[in-house]
């Protein structure tokens, strides 16, 4: 998605350790106009999948998922990072390791909101090692629903998550795949760039 | 807002301890169509305030704030619950006590995203004791920006938050104010009900 790549080049900040900061437009301050364009693009890419529900994970996926959901006319469900699982039995639960925060979360979705008949589109802002996505896929499978697609705003193509998910045979679309970045001169190379 | 009150009566669940669960349409599963109507109503209520930015706090406020922001054509900034404040100097920070989770969070907003010229509308799903809101107001004041309004979806009118905020002279609008609820028969009494 050219608009997104242009914006990453303009306002993204490359930091040491392969960190790409997009907090001025995507995950701290949010440019709603840009995210609407992202919503239209996901609609185009997943139009045929007869999506009934959009699933994401708190926190930074929620706003994107809500804007995207308008183009599919379906509800959003966001998985919660649980303090403790004391609602056993009423929820689907999984564990997700966060490398950013160096801890493991219990992540839950109420059984009321994922049903075997649901055709789920998973939406998230970033895909790196894929831990969060694998956890979300696990929640959907637990419910008997199907993962009909995964829409990612920015994929770090040099990490393994994208490959893991694609090898599962899931329809994954990333609107910008970063193949490399350089913290010294701030440049970003996207997959498909000449 | 009648549509919202009707929905709370229909799908809200009253639990012991003055807990009102609205997780089927507002803060776990999200009914985007309803939230669009909420957005239109906030636009009507705060139309004159020349809002330049919407501020909320993760996690459940984010989706609502993003949908609402579309009616104001402004960006959303969400305050983050910090793991630790190791970015001192670059952020406005405050502490917010959560009674639900029985802990105190450091809450931060990057200094890049709140400027003295900003006219801020704060959006959140619930107002009870007001701790989260007072923290967000504190962040805005730290930045030199002005709080032009606060839009709340559901206020627990029998808790002190609403009174505290209104006594500050801030333009607070709650779309549904619950004056009492009864866990035994599941009834909810809204302010203004006959």
From Swiss-Prot, chains A, B:
HAMAP family (UniProt xref):
XPRTase (MF_01184)
So which domain of life are we looking at? Bacteria
**Protein name (Swiss-Prot/TrEMBL):** Xanthine phosphoribosyltransferase
What UniProt keywords apply to this chain's record, in alphabetical order? Cytoplasm, Glycosyltransferase, Purine salvage, Transferase
So what does this one do?
Converts the preformed base xanthine, a product of nucleic acid breakdown, to xanthosine 5'-monophosphate (XMP), so it can be reused for RNA or DNA synthesis.
One Pfam family cited in the UniProt record for this chain? Pribosyltran
Gene that this polypeptide is encoded by: xpt
Listed EC numbers: 2.4.2.22
Q: Name one GO molecular function term.
A: xanthine phosphoribosyltransferase activity
InterPro entries hit by this protein: PRibTrfase_dom, PRTase-like, Pur/Pyrimidine_PRTase, Xanthine_PRibTrfase
Q: Per the record's keyword annotation, is Zinc included, yes or no?
A: no
**Assembly and partners?**
Homodimer.
Chain sites annotated for binding 5-phospho-alpha-D-ribose 1-diphosphate: 128-132
As for subcellular location, the record says:
Cytoplasm
Pathway(s) it belongs to: Purine metabolism; XMP biosynthesis via salvage pathway; XMP from xanthine: step 1/1
Q: Where does xanthine bind?
A: 20, 27, 156
Give any single GO term for biological process.
xanthine metabolic process
Q: Name one GO cellular component term.
A: cytoplasm
The record's family statement is:
Belongs to the purine/pyrimidine phosphoribosyltransferase family. Xpt subfamily.
Catalyzed reactions: XMP + diphosphate = xanthine + 5-phospho-alpha-D-ribose 1-diphosphate
